[in-house]
Amino acid sequence: MEEIQRYLQPDSSQQHNFLYPLIFQEYIYALAHDHGLNINRSILLENPGYNNQFSLLIVKRLITRMYQQNHFLISTNDSNKNTFLGCNKSLYSQMISEGFAFIVEIPFSLRLISSLSSFEGKKILKSHNLRSIHSTFPFLEDNFSHLNYVLDILIPYPVHLEILVQTLRYWVKDASSLHLLRFFLHEYWNLNSLITSKKPGYSFSKKNKRFFFFLYNSYVYECESTFVFLRNQSSHLRPTSFGALLERIYFYGKIERLVEVFAKDLQVTLWLFKDPFMHYVRYQGKSILASKGTFLLINKWKFYLVNFWQCHFSLCFHTGRIHINQLSNHSRDFMGYLSSVRLNPSMVRSQMLENSFIINNAIKKFDTLVPIIPLIGSLAKENFCTVLGHPISKPVWSDLSDSDIIDRFGRICRNLFHYYSGSSKKKTLYRIKYILRLSCARTLARKHKSTVRTFLKRSGSELLEEFLTSEEQVLSLTFPRASSSLWGVYRSRIWYLDIFCINDLANYQ
């Protein structure tokens, strides 16, 4: 790590901006093999589905071949000879692209560490569990009672190879690396395997996921620079504890660097976004923008985003990918949570001299609920219960040992409780727990060819109850409310950091 920092660290004499020579250094591939860089396995260096099965011997031979070859020998006429540098094209191209992604991540990682160090909460560097999904926690904790409209945005997907290259041209200075990037994209480009838009998220090819994830994250990072305009005149964009999460810190770091440039070049458009009181969050290819503004203002934002993305990225972006919903009339379905703003009526009796008055007040309250009907539908699809919520046995698990069966049911139960720990109402979770517990008992009774009552009487009902309620030592976050002293004691919701992705049962769409 120190050697890389010395190479990239600018000095008074010269500044090293060229990443291309690092491709020919063998220690780079060794670092990529064990996810090195000694920065606590940062999220930028760990991607789900990343294939870390590197062979250092193959890398050594590959580097030797790269030194010996004058140019890439690619056969386009004979499709049967799938060769790359005279050898297996798929294997070597994957090795080089993975190494390339690792190298280009280095300046991003160093910049991220420096931005994290500028905040007071430096303890974040000691956590191994932070993921981009955790940036949604403070969004769900924000005060939405004063907001009116919500924009549901599906981030546009790149339709041209050069768009992906241009997103990196500000960060990668040497043309050789950009040409190598173009080479990889032309090799792997396939609309069905690289990036597709059939779902709100994006799917990547099974191979080279690290390479494609890095390109996509860089592209989305560039798309989010659009919100510089929307935030410029607002003092309410930054959410509760905004300095506590990686993605938010990086997002605001980019805003601070670009706000002066954009404000100077495009002063005409800034008047549209005077004090918008907005909140923003993104996960995967879906983002949400909530604001206090009127419908006319939100509609202007919608067409502004469409026009900006069309002009800046040279793509055809349809207005149907952005939907405007009124927050008080629609429930938000985001990441398996059912969020809504409901009116909480309260009656206050006031007495003035001999007359008394009864005043009815309706206070808006933002709730994050557990969607019981879709969740039961997901359990029924996995054969844990019927569509009406009646628990049934799991026949495919009957061949497992008793401890494995209990462990699987207990893991599902704990994962759901951790995933929905931030829900404002947890009564639904206890119904889910009842379904899983009884389904586990029926599966065990089916295995031992007895009834549920007989099995529980013989083994003891405390066995299931004790296991399903056991907790593990998991890092968690809480966001205390600043107004808790005014409204009494606020019961902080707990957000667990062992959540890496949307729960499969919660992802019922």
UniProtKB/Swiss-Prot annotation:
Entries under InterPro entries matching the protein: Domain_X, Maturase_MatK, Maturase_MatK_N
Keyword Plastid included in the entry's annotation: yes
GO cellular component: chloroplast
Entries under Pfam families matching the protein: Intron_maturas2, MatK_N
Gene Ontology terms for molecular function: RNA binding
A biological process term (GO) from this entry: mRNA processing
Entry-linked PANTHER family: MATURASE K
Role according to the record: Usually encoded in the trnK tRNA gene intron. Probably assists in splicing its own and other chloroplast group II introns.
Keywords: Chloroplast, mRNA processing, Plastid, RNA-binding, tRNA processing
Superkingdom of origin organism: Eukaryota
Compartments in which it is found: Plastid, Chloroplast
Protein name: Maturase K
HAMAP family: MatK (MF_01390)
Family to which the UniProt record says this protein belongs: Belongs to the intron maturase 2 family. MatK subfamily.
